[in-house]
């Protein structure tokens, strides 16, 4: 298997696992990553599916990234922006059929789901970033802010700012903010910073 094929497999598998991890986090009810938190809150308020709303937001962000951060775009960008939300929606549907409504799950099950999902999320993100075939439009924002500020706002600060804004919006629209929100924000920020 050549390097290009391996990278494509890593990118596709990484994004698939990210979508599944988001679904499991939603089932745990301990919060999700900041971007998902925002999109869940607003999509619930507007009464449209999470997958559709996330795609619409990603298209808007993609236009900005195309203008200011073209180097961040690749096949992985398109797969991530179009796929994660719908994979997560389908995952929640399947998990609800298998486990029942999230509200009915015991605390122990929810904690196990959260631990498993956070671990999977970190592993999947590392896999899709290692493939180096583009990053999600939201993930590109920290890179772009650092670039257009001439490094006056470092990536880490930019990422914290965007995450805090997303969590604030999500919370104001009724999204669950919990321990998983903090953990995933920290893990994803570190992964992006070191990649």
Segments and roles (model prediction):
Residues 19-20, 62-63, 86, 90, ...:
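Alpha-helical transmembrane segments of multipass membrane proteins
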Residues 75-83:
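Cytoplasmic-side transmembrane-helix entry/capping segments in multi-pass membrane proteins
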Residues 106, 110-111, 177-186:
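Loop-to-transmembrane alpha-helix initiation sites
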Residues 193-194:
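Conserved small/polar residues in nucleotide/adenosyl-binding loops
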Residues 45-56:
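Structural signature of hydrophobic alpha-helical transmembrane segments
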Residues 117-143, 151, 160-166:
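Alpha-helical transmembrane segments of helical membrane proteins, especially in multi-pass transport
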Residues 61-71:
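C-terminal ends of transmembrane helices
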Residues 37-47, 140-147:
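Short amphipathic alpha-helical coupling elements at transmembrane boundaries
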């Amino acid at each position: 298997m050549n390097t290009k094929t391996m990278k494509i497999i890593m990118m596709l598998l990484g994004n698939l696992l990210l979508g599944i991890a988001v679904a499991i986090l939603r089932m745990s009810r301990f919060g999700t990553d900041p971007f998902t938190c925002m999109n869940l809150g607003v999509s619930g308020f507007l009464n449209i599916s999470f997958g559709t709303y996330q795609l619409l937001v990603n298209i808007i962000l993609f236009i900005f990234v195309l203008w200011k951060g073209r180097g961040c775009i690749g096949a992985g960008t398109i797969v991530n922006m179009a796929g994660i939300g719908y994979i997560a929606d389908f995952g929640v549907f399947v998990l609800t059929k298998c486990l029942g409504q999230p509200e009915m799950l015991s605390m122990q099950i929810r904690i196990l789901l959260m631990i498993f999902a956070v671990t999977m999320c970190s592993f999947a993100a590392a896999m899709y970033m290692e493939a180096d075939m583009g990053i999600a439009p939201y993930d590109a924002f920290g890179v772009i802010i650092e670039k257009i500020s001439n490094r006056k706002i470092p990536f880490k600060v930019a990422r914290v700012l965007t995450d805090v804004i997303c969590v604030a919006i999500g919370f104001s629209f009724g999204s669950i903010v919990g321990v998983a929100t903090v953990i995933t924000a920290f893990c994803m920020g570190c992964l992006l910073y070191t990649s």
